[in-house]
């Protein structure tokens, strides 16, 4: 990256960091069981709810316990279950039409990050009916209060239940972009481990490593605060302590509970401190090839950490020691190597590969431009790179025979 652009990026990031204490960040109020929602809706005078989820969650009956409580208390609801991985503008518009048609007055995002992000985007379109989602992409362009929004994560990974971001894919161009504004933070989050116990091992692994990526990128960036560092360290330790237990035994309710807390803490960290190039590259792959976001993050994370080199040794040392991966007596480089090796070991245990056969060489310049546009100047990354410099990651992610 040339010096002028690099200077602009760092000045932008510095200004944003200075503004953090004055911005209206908040955390959602947390419940630990879906049964608590009936009292909330009765108290708020909510009559009709739109539940945004996906077909798999509905098919496997994950909604049933909550719906039983709603039926018992005569709370009306309608279900939109067409959300796809990497939710599209089409999903958002279909769900919005159902909300308006049925005269709903609250929204529940029930599922992984896709369902919760879709719910946030629907809320934004309800709040600003004359403005398209593409006009809201970027930062601080929603402004208006959303309908009452409740997030119920069925995966421990995205942290969307506590963040100000919604990531949406344009149905026509397949460009994936983020909408970032404070009204998108859900009013309530339900961290109920019982809705996560049927999550298969593969998704337990990739969504858990998604949360790890949130925590690590938030911690190594240049816009951390005392609070975000605390949340990122807690999340990192909880993940290393519990992800293998949840992967090996999906019925381990305590491990599931701790992973939900880790995801929430990681979300609290990155919603203020942001992420980095791992996410930017992952989003560009998800938009074009529909590669699941958690899988992309898990695959990319160690290669980017290695590439940052000595600029992050001290911070990785701090994470490694806190998580019990390294000793305080280790020097920074040794501890950083141990931390990255632990991530690689995690990938191997979960049978996550190092490449994606979907990547086409001719797509790389466009994909890297999208990653550059997402990350710069917003993400306070340890090492700045432009689109051309980011191309190396796509080549590293290609199978050898495809290069």
Q: Language model features by range: what are they?
A:
Residues 1-79, 400-403:
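An N-terminal, well-structured beta->alpha segment
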Residues 2-8, 326-403:
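C-terminal charged capping/lid subdomain of soluble metabolic enzymes
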Residues 50, 58-130, 245-256:
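N-terminal small/polar loop signature for handling phosphorylated ligands or for N-terminal nucleophile
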Residues 90-194:
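Glycine/threonine-rich beta-strand-loop-alpha-helix active-site module
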Residues 157, 265-297, 375-378:
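Glycine-rich phosphate/pyrophosphate-binding beta-alpha loops
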Residues 291-354:
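Active-site pocket-lining segment
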């Amino acid at each position: 990256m040339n010096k002028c652009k690099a200077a602009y990026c760092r000045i932008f990031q510095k200004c944003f960091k200075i503004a953090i204490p004055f911005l209206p960040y908040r955390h959602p109020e947390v419940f630990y069981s879906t049964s608590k929602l009936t009292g909330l809706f009765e108290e708020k005078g909510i009559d009709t709810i739109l539940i945004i989820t996906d077909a798999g969650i509905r098919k496997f009956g994950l909604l049933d316990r909550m719906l039983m409580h709603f039926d018992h208390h005569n709370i009306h609801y309608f279900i939109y279950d067409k959300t796809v991985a990497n939710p599209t503008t089409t999903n958002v518009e279909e769900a919005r039409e159902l909300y308006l048609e049925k005269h709903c007055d609250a929204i529940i995002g029930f599922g992984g990050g896709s369902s919760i992000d879709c719910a946030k985007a629907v809320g934004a379109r309800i709040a600003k009916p004359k403005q398209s989602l593409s006009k809201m992409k970027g930062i601080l362009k929603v402004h208006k209060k959303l309908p009452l929004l409740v997030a119920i994560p069925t995966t421990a990974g995205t942290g969307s239940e506590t963040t100000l971001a919604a990531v949406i894919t344009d149905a026509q161009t397949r460009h994936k972009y983020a909408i970032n504004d404070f009204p998108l933070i859900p009013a309530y989050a339900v961290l109920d481990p019982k809705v996560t116990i049927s999550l298969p091992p593969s998704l337990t692994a990739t969504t858990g490593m998604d949360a790890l990526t949130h925590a690590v990128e938030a911690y190594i960036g240049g816009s951390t605060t005392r609070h975000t560092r605390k949340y990122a360290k807690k999340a990192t330790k909880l993940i290393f302590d519990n992800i293998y237990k949840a992967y090996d035994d999906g019925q381990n309710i305590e491990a599931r509970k701790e992973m939900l807390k880790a995801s929430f803490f990681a979300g609290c960290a990155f919603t203020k401190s942001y992420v980095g190039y791992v996410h930017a590259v992952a989003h560009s792959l998800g938009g074009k090839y529909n590669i699941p976001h958690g899988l992309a993050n898990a695959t990319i994370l160690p290669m980017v950490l290695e590439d940052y080199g000595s600029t992050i040794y001290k911070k990785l040392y701090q994470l490694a020691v806190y998580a019990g991966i390294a000793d305080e007596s280790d020097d920074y480089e040794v501890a950083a190597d141990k931390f990255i090796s632990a991530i690689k070991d995690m990938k191997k245990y979960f049978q996550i590969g190092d490449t994606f056969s979907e990547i086409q060489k001719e797509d790389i310049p466009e994909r890297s431009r999208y990653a550059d546009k997402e990350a710069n100047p917003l993400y306070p990354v340890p090492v700045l790179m432009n689109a051309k410099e980011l191309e190396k990651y796509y080549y590293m992610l290609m199978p050898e025979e495809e290069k």
